[in-house]
Amino acid sequence: MHPARPALWAAALTALTLLRGPPVARAGAGAVGAGPVVRCEPCDARALSQCAPPPTAPACTELVREPGCGCCLTCALREGDACGVYTERCGTGLRCQPRPAEQYPLRALLNGRGFCANASAAGSLSTYLPSQPAPGNISESEEEHNAGSVESQVVPSTHRVTDSKFHPLHAKMDVIKKGHARDSQRYKVDYESQSTDTQNFSSESKRETEYGPCRREMEDTLNHLKFLNVLSPRGVHIPNCDKKGFYKKKQCRPSKGRKRGFCWCVDKYGQPLPGYDTKGKDDVHCLSVQSQ
C-alpha cells in the first residue's frame, strides 16, 4: 500500500465528519457513534506535557482541541471564518461546511475553503450531493431507459398517459415492446455470464487434472515459503516430480551439512511402497521397484 494513502483516507473521513455534524467522543471515552470512526490515542499526561500554554483572552474567546487527534488547546474559529480539515475547529454551535456554490465540497474542505456556520442552520451532506429526481420530474430519456424495469407494468405512468391520451393503444404497445427488449437483453447478459462462469470452471478443472498431486504439493510448498521470515533448508521438503506432475519413484530429504538426506521409493501418487524401508540409507535405487 502506498504510504500516503492512509493519511488521505483519514482526511476524507474527517471531511465526511465535518459535513455530517460535530465529531463523536474520543474512542477511549466509550462513546459509540454511527459511521466511520477514527480511533485516536488517549491524551495522557505525557501528551499533555508537550503542549504549549493555551492562548488567553482577549485574543482568544474560546478554547477547543486541536484538529484531528491532537491533545493541545487552541483558539476556536468564529462564525464566518475560513475552515477545513487541517485548520482549527469551529466554536461551539458552529460547523465547518463548504460554500453553497461549491462544486466539489469534500475537496473544498480538504483545501480549507469551508466556512464556520451555525450548526442548526447548516445543511447535511445530502445538500451538497446530487439529489435523486422526483418521480414526476423524470426526463424523457430516463423514462424510456427505465420503462422495462417492472415486468408486469403494461400501463404507462400518469404523466405519460396525459401526453398520449389520444393514442392509448400505441402507448401500451410501446411499453410492452420496451419491456420485451429489456427482458431479452437481461437474458442475454445472464446467459453470457453463465457461459463465462462455465468456461472458467472447465478451465480450472482441466488445469487441476493436467497437474498431478506432486506438482500441486510443490506449488503449495513454494507458496508457503513466501510467507516465512526465516528459511531453514532442513525443514523444507520439495518433492521430486515428473513432467506430468506426478511423483518420481525416488524421493529424498535435503542434506544436513555433510550428512546426506535419506531417500525412499514411492508410487506415482506419493505413497511409500510397502515392504521397502530405506530410512537411514544413503544410496537407494528405485528403478527395479514396481509402482503400484
Curated annotation (Swiss-Prot):
Modified residues (Phosphoserine): 149, 202
Maturation and modification: Phosphorylated by FAM20C in the extracellular medium.
CDD domains, sorted: TY
Pfam family, one: IGFBP
Gene Ontology biological process terms in this record: apoptotic process; MAPK cascade; negative regulation of cell population proliferation; negative regulation of smooth muscle cell migration; negative regulation of smooth muscle cell proliferation; osteoblast differentiation; positive regulation of apoptotic process; positive regulation of insulin-like growth factor receptor signaling pathway
SMART domains, alphabetized: IB (SM00121), TY (SM00211)
Listed Polar residues bias regions: 192-203
Domain spans labelled Thyroglobulin type-1: 211-286
Primary location group: secreted
Cystine pairs: 40-69, 43-71, 51-72, 60-75, 83-96, 90-116, 214-241, 252-263, 265-286
Subcellular compartments: Secreted
Domain of life: Eukaryota
Endpoints of the signal sequence: 1-27
Sugar-bearing residue positions: 118, 137, 200
GO function terms (MF aspect): fibronectin binding; insulin-like growth factor binding; insulin-like growth factor I binding; protein tyrosine phosphatase activator activity
Keywords: Apoptosis, Disulfide bond, Glycoprotein, Growth factor binding, Phosphoprotein, Secreted, Signal
InterPro entries: Growth_fac_rcpt_cys_sf, IGFBP-3, IGFBP-like, IGFBP_1-6_chordata, Insulin_GF-bd_Cys-rich_CS, Thyroglobulin_1, Thyroglobulin_1_sf
Assembly information from the UniProt record: Interacts with XLKD1. Binds IGF2 more than IGF1. Forms a ternary complex of about 140 to 150 kDa with IGF1 or IGF2 and a 85 kDa glycoprotein (ALS). Interacts with TMEM219.
PANTHER family attached to this UniProt entry: INSULIN-LIKE GROWTH FACTOR BINDING PROTEIN, INSULIN-LIKE GROWTH FACTOR-BINDING PROTEIN 3
Biological function: IGF-binding proteins prolong the half-life of the IGFs and have been shown to either inhibit or stimulate the growth promoting effects of the IGFs on cell culture. They alter the interaction of IGFs with their cell surface receptors. Also exhibits IGF-independent antiproliferative and apoptotic effects mediated by its receptor TMEM219/IGFBP-3R. Promotes testicular germ cell apoptosis.
Protein name: Insulin-like growth factor-binding protein 3
Gene source species: Mus musculus
Gene coding for it: Igfbp3
